[in-house]
Amino acid sequence: MKSSSKIRTVQKLSGFCQSPDVRALCFLFLLLSASCSFIFRDYLYGNDLMIFNDIGSDTWQQYIMNYTSIVNHLRDGSFSLWDFNNGLGINQFNFNLFDPFLMLLYGVGVVLGPAHMLLYINVIQILKIMVAAFAFYWFLSQFSFSVPSKMITSYAYALNGFLLVWGQHYQFGTVVIYFPLMLLFCEKFIQKKKGKALFPVMVFLCGIYSVYFTYMCLAATGLYLLFRILMLDGLTWKERIQRFLLGCAEMIMGVGMSLVVFLPMAEVLLNVSSRLESDGTGLLDFLRQCFTPYSRKFYLSMLKRMFSSNLQNGYGLAKGPQQYVMNYYEDPVLFCSTLAVFLNVQFLAVLRKADMTKRAKRVLYGVAALILVGTALPVGGTVFNYFTLPTQRYTFVLMTVFLLLMAWMRDYMRKGGKLNLVLILAVTALMGWAYWCGYEQAGFQEYRTNILILTVTGILTAVCLTLLCFLKDIQIRNVILGVMGVVLVVNVVSEGGTNYQNRVTMKKTDVPAEVMVQETQRYEEMRTSDDKEIKYRAEIEKPQDFFREMYRVDLADCLNYLKEKDPTFYRVEKDYISGTVSMDSSGQGYRGISTYNSVMNGNVKEFVETCYPELFFADHNHYTFWNNVDDNWLAAFLGVKYILSGNGEPDETKYKLLDQVGSLYIHENVLDAQTAHFYTQDISEESLKELCTEENREELLGEAIALEDGTEIGDASEIQTLKPEEQETAEQNSSVTLDAPQKDSVVTGSVHAEADGYALFMIPYEKGWSLTIDGEKAELLRGDIGFLACEVPEGDHTILLTFEAPGLKAGTIGSVLFWILFAQSRLLIIRKNKTRKSAGA
């Protein structure tokens, strides 16, 4: 019995290994491994890390610092859903905590350390490419495509422009995997195949990954569901509507199952940040915005980017001149091989004679019209960006459509289908124009080489397609299709590698300290060269001291010294730039105020815009203090008590020298720098907004607290008339002290109030915070536009501020209920199937 069981197991395994799909996937894995070895050669075998400081500077200046902060908190056991190491403080649901690939990266960081974690970012990008290929192959397997068509199309999908361009922003690339998987289970639902019951689970996995991209995926999947049901024959309209509504219910169930994460992330995106702000226009203005054509330059960029994402780079993606409408990322990303352009255009021509029902043809022409209108006009970018300002970040949806049609067209050609020669020539001419324009403005030789390779492979593709117009022999046609497959590999590998060349990247090792001066001098000479290629290549070769600065021992010693010396909740800043422009605190583990955040707290942003716009650096997503150190009053107001500096002689009217640790000096603010303040007088927010100037802001912020329903004043001087001398004295003798948090989501402190008044906490005003005074729950107010505040009665009190991510409790309850509903519905399906089988028997 045992031997026969083993024989059956071996036979099953042998049959599995001989499966055409398994062999195709093995070959696909090997082909992608070789391709990625070439594309990422400088990152795998050279000194580059997939961390950019050019147009992709979010990776260096923001993302890796966020990841480092998360890893550091996990390693020392202090992780919480609020983080004071990021600016004035941030809800951790701002980040994609449950992106599976980022979770893998965090795990590497916890085990090996945050610095070593950075070495594996490019490995994770390659892993995404592999998973994307397998996911798309699985999706294509729901149809009757041939194995070669599925394999070559999945290869093109794995190296599509969106994953290789937007994938440089790490979490953005993951959607390229989730979307075809959602379509896969949607298709199983439509065809009533085994596994259709897992459709909501796939939506759940997407829902805990990203609210922003889940919305786009759901919108696109809903359209896919609608059009696929319309294509089906043999259904009444009532049955179609029922099937569509049931599919929508499955998606809603999946979102409900993900509410434990989805809802807190949605709270941040929709209620705190200003990422999705609209201009508040009326319906007619909104429709005009949706259907007013883009500029001519946009359409030219769109045409070029169908053939390559690198035709407008000019002299690189750093400080060199470029030819984009917006930039390398935000212009439409449409490339998924030159062959895909030819075949998608051909599809529109051959569809009318294709072997499918008239209903299916009409639906597909409708889909084509919808895609054309959605991409050519702002309506597509508007709808996919939550009906706000249009963006082009939804184009990952188009990659799936383009390559699905490419797979169909390849099988159509394999079966002897006729092609339209005129369209082949037209696309060839358009391709020639795009590559000619790109070559003319390409600055670096690497860009020109890529364009030449794309041109040659494009011409070879056109020649192969032209031959297919005339040759009827199936064997010869298969040879030509094989040649086209090889040409496609060269095409996408050349283009893919170019996305990662001539980039300003972080290096795996710093320039040695002893040659830093010499290398910096060489960089300056290159930067001022008359030769444009040398001049713009300078940023690529700029000497690096990132790791030396980020992990310097004396800075860690300074922070430990302050931690032992001062038990209160204080903030630290630096008067110099080291690892990043504004995110060193996240990486180095101290509480500052500088930050870079694309989804900035809208209340704090309004405070900065109103009172201290000089905190903005370059745009409204960066706050920096190193260039505002001289304003020690602002430092004291925000709780910046200590400054780390390389200067041993501070301005003694503002800071005093506290100590020296290594080569760093610790300066202490001469003013009373606290993270909380006491006031006896209030003014209205509107008064603060109307009156605040550079000349009177210290008086307005220092003498009164601004509340939403505070006292209206016409001039800053009126505050003194509102406060009698006794009230002024009581205010001066009162204090609010916060203790250093052990976990940032829990802040304790005490209040000494010699009169009734208000406490202002220099913590961003955000849903999720709750307050107790002497154990009794108290109401939190919005103070000074951007911060937490409360009323405080006279006397001595203890306070407790606690942060619970808004939406987390409700989301947890919702998730539990929807999971129960999911389990019950699946059990019901199983029972129905058993009943049906027994009735059939």
Protein language model regions, located:
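Extracytoplasmic/lumenal acceptor-recognition loop(s) of multi-pass membrane glycoenzymes
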Residues: 90, 94, 487-549, 560-634, ...
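Periplasmic/ER-lumenal interhelical loops and adjacent helix-loop junctions
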Residues: 57-74, 78-81, 91, 95-103, ...
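Membrane-embedded helix bundles of polyisoprenyl
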Residues: 34, 126, 130-143, 148-232, ...
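Membrane-interface helix-loop-helix junctions at transmembrane boundaries of multi-pass membrane enzymes
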Residues: 235-245, 346-372, 595, 610
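Contiguous transmembrane helix-bundle modules in multi-pass membrane proteins
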Residues: 192-195, 213, 363-551, 794-841
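Active-site lumenal/periplasmic loops and adjacent helix-entry segments of GT-C-fold
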Residues: 41-143, 148-180, 205, 290-330
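Hydrophobic, aromatic-rich transmembrane alpha-helices
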Residues: 323, 336-368, 461-471, 827
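Active-site-proximal, structured, solvent-exposed surfaces of multi-pass membrane proteins
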Residues: 5-8, 66, 704-841
